[in-house]
Regions:
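A generic structural motif
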Residues: 75-77, 130-135, 159-164
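Active-site segments of SGNH/GDSL-like serine hydrolases
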Residues: 119-144, 166
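N-terminal secretory targeting modules
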Residues: 1-48, 94-97, 199
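Conserved SGNH/GDSL esterase-like catalytic core that processes O-acyl groups on lipids
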Residues: 38-115, 135-141
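Solvent-exposed, polar/charged alpha-helical surfaces in well-ordered, non-transmembrane soluble domains
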Residues: 50, 58, 62, 66, ...
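Catalytic His-Asp segment of secreted/periplasmic serine-dependent ester chemistry enzymes
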Residues: 144-201
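Loop/turn elements at helix/coil->beta-strand transitions in domains of secreted/extracellular proteins
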Residues: 46-47, 69-71, 96-101, 124-129, ...
């Protein structure tokens, strides 16, 4: 089991490295592949986004990088929100002044209110977009409820409803119904693009 997990981590690190070094696609190709408006593709291509997440984000990292060529992705297998503020601070050394933050955490355990507070302090007044949780885990619904509550506390915290978008779409995922693949990873990236560019579909 440990060997398999180590192989998975190595594979995901390789995938993430490839994503961060990807050659940008043309805007037309992005719009067509991800079924987003050309204006969405254009805006996304110009945004500096600092993304921090868990293995779900790793699974969609190549797609995120195609849509957001200036996105810096720091995603890790098994990551939880307890280290979010520290992880964000460290990631800011790679992108000190992002236009927006994208966070994808909550798959691996419970999110606490003070963890979100600490992360929002690091983000300052910059927009923070948090991808909510789509997973058959006991903490998924409480996490999503907390995120919705915290978005009312912070005007610059926006929740991206991945759980609603992905509901009933088992073909978008690997057998665990958590990690997106193929069409699912494309839909994940498209949802992020439409959310961060604030362009109505």
């Amino acid at each position: 089991m440990y060997k398999r997990q180590a192989q998975q981590i190595a594979l995901q690190k390789k995938q993430l490295a490839e994503a961060n070094n990807k050659v940008p696609m043309s805007l037309k190709a992005v719009a067509e592949k991800y079924k987003v408006q050309p204006v969405v593709a254009e805006k996304a291509s110009q945004m500096n986004v600092l993304a921090l997440g868990d293995s779900v984000m790793v699974a969609a990292s190549t797609n995120l990088q195609e849509v957001f060529p200036h996105m810096y992705i720091d995603a890790a297998v098994g990551r939880q929100a307890e280290s979010l503020a520290t992880d964000l601070t460290n990631a800011k050394s790679k992108m000190p002044n992002p236009d927006a933050y994208l966070i994808g955490l909550g798959t691996n355990g419970t999110i606490k209110e003070d963890e979100i507070d600490a992360a929002m302090k690091v983000a300052g007044n910059k927009p923070v977009y948090w991808m909510n949780v789509h997973a058959d885990r006991v903490w998924a619904k409480p996490n999503n409820n907390l995120l919705t509550k915290m978005a009312k506390k912070y005007k610059n915290l926006k929740i991206i409803d991945w759980n609603k978008k992905a509901s009933g779409q088992s073909s978008w995922f690997y057998s665990d119904n958590i990690h997106p693949k193929g069409t699912g990873a494309e839909k994940y990236a498209a949802l992020v693009a439409n959310s961060l560019t604030n362009v109505e579909k």
